[in-house]
Each structure stands twice: as structure tokens, then as C-alpha cells.
Amino acid sequence: MASGGKGEKILVSVRVRPQNEKEKARNDICDWECVNNTTIVCNNNLPERSLFPSTYTFDKVFGFDSPTKQVYEDGAKEVALCVLGGINSSIFAYGQTSSGKTYTMCGITKFAMDDIFCYIQKHTDRKFTLKFSAIEIYNEAVRDLLSGDNNQRRLLDDPERGTVVEKLIEETIQDRTHLEELLTVCETQRKIGETSLNEVSSRSHQILRLTIESTGREYSPDSSSTLAASVCFIDLAGSERASQTLSAGTRLKEGCHINRSLLTLGTVIRKLRFDPCDIAQSQVENLLKSTAEERSSRMDEQSMFSSMDFDADFRRRSYDSTDLGEPSIINNLTERNFEFLENSEEDDFLLDDKTPQFSRHNLYDDWEELVQITDERLEDACKEVRCIEPEAEQSSGQPAACESHDSLDDIKAENEDMEISTPAEKENVDLSLKTIDVNAKPETYELTLKNSDLEIGPSVEAQESQESVNEEEQMKNEERKMSPSTKQAEQCLNKEENAQSEQQSTEDCELNSLPINNQSEATVEVELTPNDAKLDEDATSRDKWESKQQQEADKDCNESSVCKNIGTDDNDNDTYMALKEKVKEMQKKIEYLMSMHTAEQQQSPSFRRDFKSPPEYFTAKRSRSCRENLLSVRSPHWFESLEVSNNTSPTWRVMQTKASPGRPNTSSISFDSGSSTSIDTRSLKDYDPEMGNSFREFVAGLEEMAKKHHSIDSTPELDYGIPYAPTKTERMEIRPESPADSVAANGQYSISSSDFERQQRKIIELWAACNVPLVHRTYFFLLFKGDPSDYVYMEVELRRLSFLKQTISNDMETSRMQTVKALTREKEWISKQLPKKFPWNQRIGLYQKWGVEVNSKQRSLQVAHKLWTNTQDMDHIKESASLVAKLLGFVEPSRMPKEMFGLSLLPRTENVKSSGWRFTKSFSAIRLTR
């Protein structure tokens, strides 16, 4: 920023490009002369009545002998580093075509990044977060340079951020090398073309934006809490004349769009000299609108060269730049900047004091916090009710036990009314998975009975204390109004209902009972399903609940004689009805919130469950967000009597062969968790016997390996969450049969290096025969290095490929052609990644290394077709895997999970749809999942 006049103004610098070889060959004369570091003079003879001056004054003028480092230090450094102080800044490169704008901007960007990282290293007291984005405007179409596609992005108006680009990728910078890689990607993605004036002319406007957020590691009142600002490096395309560039077709169209956008930009600059304006006739002005606002600073770097033909262009742009230097609207700029920095700390305090709000789109993310808040509010309300309860007893003269018990009966009746549904609805409710857990998450309602007090949690909102008092009084009035006959009839009805509930609970206990420690209170959990809310009693407290119910039923009979003689008032009936309506309204609110939360969970990808009918499948499921092991209610009697069914039994899905023309239709072949093979009879009608035998052998082999792999775990667990202890017969069945399959002392399979190399070579040959995708080969080759634990995975891959080869050989040519086409498309995609990942000099060495002529066509595609071709040369295989890994950006092999190749014997919690064994897709996911 340069100070002058009434305040700070936009810094404008001019750099003169030296003559190139063509200009020297033509003996061109320099028409511009740098008098000093602020003035430039035109040496060309001007007409007497010329409207243009011969001398121009700018903030900085750099001659043709000035290096880019000096241009940055004197003209752009202060503006670029404003972003570290929380001030938005922008650096433009503006000039005619072939004037060296891109060359200058690349150097300025590099030096600015160096200074920013140096500043970050020195100021260790603050935590910095850097985000980088890059966009390109080509023919008035906005494109994201980091996305890798040519899709056009829309411009959206945000009330807080201004004009934003739709789905713009913002990369979080990890280090200096990461930023250099992103700059290289932007350089390769930008549109360039050849014209008569420039061989590598930029045909688009490029905007590189670096956003820096800094936060103090230790809070102090003297420093602001958080600073956030952005610096934009803008390389505008050069203006050009069609008569000089001799362009036509696409180049002419590009030049028209470039000139139109630059003309609009000049108009905006001239109008900004007097008043702010809302002119946005092109995409450039839309995106750069924030650079002309108050909270920003800007530096305009003009590039020019000494040519007589371009004097008019430079003079026209000089007028625009002179307009930029006027400080008429810039005075408010710095004042607002400093005001913004001073008020940032106060704004942070205001934001911290605000109560967290919950909206519908993030309801299931903050569910636990919402439940905790509502629990606290409800607990406070219950305490107030308990404090007021003795006063109400004294005023009415009625025992508290009778009152609390009657309210308990009413609430139970309300809950039973909520459970009543049609038979069809009950079937839907029964399809839900019930969870009975002492330490369950607060996704369920809990009715806790302790010392004859009733607590309901969590609810939508806590009822106020006055409403609670009204409930108690209305309950008492209703009790007074009831006649002895009515009381006796109600008690008989309650006894019948209690007897039915005891009988039902006894039946449920036979199914769901589990040993658990004695507890001092009984808990009833209600888990809401997508269709209805159902009340389920805790299996660990069945006996206590039954005895408590019987005692309270007897207590009703004794207390009825005490309560029947109490008089009633005329308005008791109305009061009771009003209370009942309030209770119903509260229940509706609770039901609405829980149903809304359930619906949000169903829409989210983290809420996927298998719905099985309780008689066959009655176990606990767990969502991805829940990391606790939930107790299941599966009785040994039910487990022993489990019958394998095609529709209801939990089975291990191994694979599914997709039907193709000329190929028999086959559905999934599965074996259950007990390792007993079960094959769908419907799929065996048209099944090939030879293919079926091989398939059975493959499944049997995997089944045997699954047993062995399951036996090496120290404490294996079934999917039910119950520790598994193999019987004597099972231990005999899983005993190793060969030295290769023996279990070492550390609990892993032992495998010699010769056996590993033999299996590896055989797998590589089968990969080539089956046309397995190169991505899968690379992952597998880099991940499994011969560790003892790799034996199972190598054996599974070998069996899978052997079965696949036999299947393809028995099948028609359709499947083989499909795999060949898929592999060809993959190689074409890999060839497109070579220019993006490697610069030109590295690609030359790569072509020579793989035996591709440098002057030939489609060199990258030739390299892609040479990958993984020589299956006998291990050096060739290693080089192929290394190249594919670099192109695809694979992580380190030590960080890649081996379970990604499908030998995850523990069942997955979500309902994963079987994608089938498609020959046109990757063969990297054969999972033993349920």
C-alpha cells in the first residue's frame, strides 16, 4: 500500500518487458523510456492535437532490466502480506497480449507464498489454517481448476460471503510442497493457445485464492481471537486486436470474450473513481466484486512492451490505472479494515454466548447434545414438582402414595393407547429391531419407577412447574369424584391387565432373559421405530417388575377404601379433562420429535438396518455413529432352534454372479454363520453342474478358511455381542491339517518366502488371464509383502482367481470381451493421468524408460498399455505397480487396511447391498459380510 493524498490508495505498478528474439530481429525501437522509478515517457512522435499525454506517473515503474524479485519486493509484498493481518487483498496482472503477465504473476505468487510460510514459522503463538482454491473464466464460463473436469460452475449470491462459486473445491494446505503441487495442477489445467503474437497465449482469466485463518493458541485480551482473510492472485488474459493477431474461428471467439470482459472491467474502474457501482456485466466483475469493496486492498501490476503498435492500448489502460490511484473511496477502506479488526474480539464473545441452535438438517448429528439439554430441563421441572407435592398433599388431605399411583395408572393407560394399532401396523412394528441395554443411548424413552416417583425422559421440552401442580390437583379431584363401584370396577380391570402383562412378560423372559446384576430400580425402555413407538420391558428386571406390579395392584384395593369417602367439587370433571388433554399433547410432542429424528436417521447414510421378524431374528443392531457394544437378547434356546431359511436366516453373503446373454441365471450362493452351506433352490434349476461343482468347491474352501481365520482370534465374538467358546467338536474341526496352514505361537499363520513367491507369481499370471483391473493388482501387490498374516488373503485371492478363470473359460466370449473393454477403458483413464501428475521433463524420461518413442503419437497411452504385461519379470511388475500408485495417489502400504480385500469375518452392522460379481467392475471386494 502506498500512502498519499487523503489516505491509502490502490498501488499501481508498471513493468516494461524486454524485447524478445523476434523483435530484435526486426530491429524494433523502444518507444517507452523509464525516466525514474515512478515516471514513464513515450518517445514516439505524437500528433499536435493528440488527446493522449506523453508522460505517465505511477506508484512504481520497473524497467526491462528489473528482476521479478524486485517487482515483488517494491510493488506487491506489502499488499500480499496484508492477508496475515486479516485484510483481504488482490494482485492483478493487467496488460495486452504477450506482455509477460503470466510470467510476472508466477514469480509474484511464488515469492508471496515463501514469505507467508516464513511468517507462519516465525509466529508459533498462533495456529494458521490455509485453504487454496483456483478458478478459470474461459469464454464467460467459470471452471474449477482443481476438480479435474470441464463442467461449468454457477455463480451464487451469498448474503454474507458475497458472490461464490457453486461446488468450488477448497484444498487445505498441508505444507509448502502440497501448495506447489496444486499450483502445478492449475498451470496444466489452464487454457492456452497459440496466436501470431504469442505461442503460449493465455486464453482465460485465472484467479488463485489463498484463504488464511489464524487463531491464538493461548487466549489473551490483547490479541484478537481469530483473523480470516483472503489474497487473490489474478492473471487476466491479455487484450488483443484481431487485425494484429490475425485470429479466426475459436481464437477470434476467445478474443471477443476477453476484450469484452476487460472493457467492462475498465468501465467499473472508472466509475469507482467517483462512487461505488453495481455494474457486473461479465463473470470477471462478478467474482472480483469483493476486491472493490471496503474491506480489501489491491495492487494492479501492468505489463507492457516497447512496441509502437500498442501505444493506444497502453494509454487507454493508463487512464484506468490513474483512476485507480484516486483515494476518493479508499479512505473508508482502511478505516473499516481497522474497525473490523478491533471489533473481531467482541464479535467472538458474542458468538460464544449464543445458545446452540438445532436445525432439521443437523438434528441427528447433535442428537446427544439435544437430549442432554432436555434431560436437564426436565429434571429441574421434576424437582420443582417434588417440592410443591407436600403442599398439595396438605391442602387436599390425600396421601401421596394414592396420588402418585393413580397418576402412574393414567400414564400407563396413555402409553397403552399409543401402542394400540391395527394388525397391519403391528406387523410393521414387529419388524423393528428391539434393543434392551442397561447403558443404552438416549434414543429411547425411559420410565423409571423409584420411590413411587415417575420420571419421563427425554421429552421435547420440560413442562413448567405450574402445569405440573395442575396435573397433581386434577388427579386428586378425579380420585375424589370416583364412586366406590367405579373404583372397584377400575381395580378389577387393572388386575386383568396386570395379569395379561405378567403372562406376556413371562413369555418374553423365556426368549429374552439374560443374567445381570441386581438393581434397585426397574427400567422400561421404549424404542421408536419408523412406523410406531413400542413399549418393551427390560429383561434384566422382569421379576422385580412383576412383583412391584402385584404389590401396587393390592395397594389399589387398600387405598380405594380411604379415597372413596372424599368429597368432590363441581368443576373436578372439567379439570380432569383439561389435564388429560395436556398429557396427550405432551405425548404427541414427544412422539413428533422422536419420529422426526427417526426420519432424519433413515434419510442419512449412517442409519441402515436389517428388518427381521422377531421370532427368527431378534438381535441388537448398531449404527455407524454408535461405538458401544450393545447387549443382545438372543436366548440359547432360540439359537439352537434356528432354522436356515432363504428369507429370514442371517447368512454370509459370499458373491452373486450377474446374468449375461448366453449365461445361466444364478443368484447368490450363501452359507450361514454356522458354516453350513445353503444354496437357493430356485437358482439351481438352470444351473450348470460343472460350474456348480466348482462353485461349491470355492465356497467350501472359503468356508474352511473362515473357520481357521476365526479360530486365531484371542477372544472371538459373534455378531450378537456374546463371547464365543468353541465346543470340543468344533475345536477338532478347525484343527490345522497341513504345515502351511499351521498356526504359529503368536496366533498367526506361518508361510515361507518360497511359498509366498510361488503364490504371488501364480496370482500375477491369473490376473493377466482374467483381465483383472490394474488398480486392484497394484493395491494387492503393494499391500501383501509376505507377512505371516498374509497367508489367508493370498489363499483367498488365489481361489477366487482360479474360480474366475474356470468360469470365464466355461462361459461364452461375452464375459471375456467385457473384461477386455473394461481393462482398456482403465488404461485410457490412466494415460490421461500421466500429463497431470508428471511435468514434461519427467514424462520424457518416463517414455524412454518404458521404450516409447518421444516423437510418436499417444505416448501416454502406449505407456499405459505396457503396464503389467510381462508376468515373468518381477522388476517389471514392481515398476508397473509403482507407476500406477503414483498416478492414483495411493497411500502408504502400511496405512492401507487389509480388510479392504474382503476377508472381514466379523459381520458388518449395516445392510450392505450385494453389488454382484460384475466382470466390468473392479474385483477388489469379495466380502464375507452379512
Swiss-Prot record:
The keyword Ubl conjugation applies. ATP binds at residues 95-102. One of its GO terms (cellular component) is microtubule. Residues 449-569, 655-686 are annotated as: Disordered. Residues 459-468, 666-681 have a biased composition (Low complexity). GO terms for molecular function: ATP binding; microtubule binding; microtubule motor activity. SUPFAM superfamilies: P-loop containing nucleoside triphosphate hydrolases. Keywords: ATP-binding, Isopeptide bond, Microtubule, Motor protein, Nucleotide-binding, Ubl conjugation. One of its GO terms (biological process) is microtubule-based movement. There is a cross-link at residue 805 (Glycyl lysine isopeptide (Lys-Gly) (interchain with G-Cter in ubiquitin)). It comes from the Eukaryota. Disulfide bonds: none annotated. It holds the Pfam family DUF3490. Residues 9-273 form the Kinesin motor domain. Belongs to the TRAFAC class myosin-kinesin ATPase superfamily. Kinesin family. KIN-7 subfamily. This is Kinesin-like protein KIN-7J.
